[in-house]
UniProtKB/Swiss-Prot annotation:
Entry protein name: Cuticle protein 6
Domain annotation Chitin-binding type R&R: ranges: 31-92
Keyword Ligase applies: no
Disulfide bonds: none
Cellular component per GO, a single term: chitin-based extracellular matrix
Source superkingdom: Eukaryota
InterPro entries per record: Cuticle_Struct_Prot, Insect_cuticle
Pfam families assigned: Chitin_bind_4
GO MF annotation: an example: structural constituent of chitin-based larval cuticle
Length: 139
């Protein structure tokens, strides 16, 4: 007679898979105003529209790192704007402005000073001559 050896076995584990709960609602009136909400599959969205056409809402989801991301927004006559979010990058701080002095103004050389004086003298003489005998008769 042959005896079968007792083989080791893996214990049986029973697991329950969590069931995704999904909720939603929608309401609308004859003026075009509406409100809706949807939640499920690790995401959520809520939105309302007023009689003036402006829309306010939020959406949220779980990003690949497991972080819950929420974004609140407004869409109206000024366009779509995010008014609050926890996933926006932060700008780096501006570096300190160094205290730098500019160069000193250029000083005129003696030749430039003499040329300016000669030009001013010629200009003044021409202005006096033009005042004495104008090209157009003034009555």
């Amino acid at each position: 007679q042959y005896v079968y050896p007792v083989l080791p076995y893996a214990p049986i584990h029973h697991y329950t898979v969590p069931v995704q709960v999904s909720t939603q609602y929608h309401a609308q009136d004859i003026l075009g105003q509406f409100a809706f909400h949807h939640a499920g599959d690790n995401q959520v969205r809520t939105e309302t529209k007023s009689f003036d056409g402006s829309v306010r809402g939020l959406y949220g989801y779980v990003d690949p790192t497991g972080k819950l991301v929420n974004v609140h927004y407004v869409a109206d006559s000024n366009g779509f704007r995010v008014v609050g979010a926890n996933n926006l990058p932060e700008a780096p701080s501006a570096p300190a402005v160094p205290d730098v002095k500019g160069p000193e103004p250029v000083q005129d050389t003696p030749e430039v000073v003499a040329a300016r004086a000669a030009f001013q003298k010629s200009y003044d003489e021409a202005a006096q001559a033009a005042a004495v005998s104008p090209d157009v008769q003034v009555s």
